[in-house]
Amino acid sequence: MAKTHFQGNETATSGELPQVGDNLAEFNLVNTELGEVSSKDFQGRKLVLNIFPSVDTGVCATSVRKFNEAAASLENTTVLCISKDLPFALGRFCSAEGIENVTPVSAFRSTFGEDNGIVLEGSPLKGLLARSVIVVDENGKVAYTQLVDEISTEPDYDAALAALN
């Protein structure tokens, strides 16, 4: 189990993030129209997986906004914003904020969190996804990972985006 912190208190995750060079585990998530989104849908494209507990928190919302801004200039890259929020909440947030360059998807009925070792095991956020980023190359290999040390802080956007090159 990996360790992260929530408001200064250590909490464990359900496992470890995949290692750089590993194949990303196949996944199925749910988009804002309740349609299935599969890792197979992105074959041949680079992926940035912006993973967070809930879009209804300030830091999570900020991460979606910042990756949305960055995604506008990325080539052959899809940015997935992933939480266990219901698809309706993700859609409402993105509509209200004018978010159009990222793909919001929900892991609410998926093993995505377990498969990537990022389900929070403790803290008041138990069961939600830990704030993390996974960058995947066009061949499905993990190029970068970050488990953010303090859930209430933002990920390292620059490092994640640099891993695309």
Curated annotation (Swiss-Prot):
CDD domains: PRX_Atyp2cys
InterPro entries for the chain: Redoxin, Thioredoxin-like_sf, Thioredoxin_domain, TPX, Tpx_CS, Tpx_Peroxidase_subfamily
Enzyme class: oxidoreductase
Domain Thioredoxin: 18-165
EC numbers on record: 1.11.1.24
Pfam families: Redoxin (PF08534)
Keywords: Antioxidant, Disulfide bond, Oxidoreductase, Peroxidase, Redox-active center
Disulfide feature: 60-94
SUPFAM superfamilies: Thioredoxin-like (SSF52833)
Regions that span the bilayer: none
Taxonomy, superkingdom: Bacteria
Active site: 60
Catalysed reaction, written as an equation: a hydroperoxide + [thioredoxin]-dithiol = an alcohol + [thioredoxin]-disulfide + H2O
Molecular function as annotated in GO: thioredoxin peroxidase activity
Signal peptide: none
Quaternary context: Homodimer.
Further comment found in the protein's record: The active site is a conserved redox-active cysteine residue, the peroxidatic cysteine (C(P)), which makes the nucleophilic attack on the peroxide substrate. The peroxide oxidizes the C(P)-SH to cysteine sulfenic acid (C(P)-SOH), which then reacts with another cysteine residue, the resolving cysteine (C(R)), to form a disulfide bridge. The disulfide is subsequently reduced by an appropriate electron donor to complete the catalytic cycle. In this atypical 2-Cys peroxiredoxin, C(R) is present in the same subunit to form an intramolecular disulfide.
Family from the record: Belongs to the peroxiredoxin family. Tpx subfamily.
UniProt-listed NCBIfam families: PRK00522.1 (NF001808)
Function: Thiol-specific peroxidase that catalyzes the reduction of hydrogen peroxide and organic hydroperoxides to water and alcohols, respectively. Plays a role in cell protection against oxidative stress by detoxifying peroxides.
Name this polypeptide is given: Thiol peroxidase
Source organism of the structure: Corynebacterium glutamicum (strain ATCC 13032 / DSM 20300 / JCM 1318 / BCRC 11384 / CCUG 27702 / LMG 3730 / NBRC 12168 / NCIMB 10025 / NRRL B-2784 / 534)
Organismal lineage: Bacteria, Bacillati, Actinomycetota, Actinomycetes, Mycobacteriales
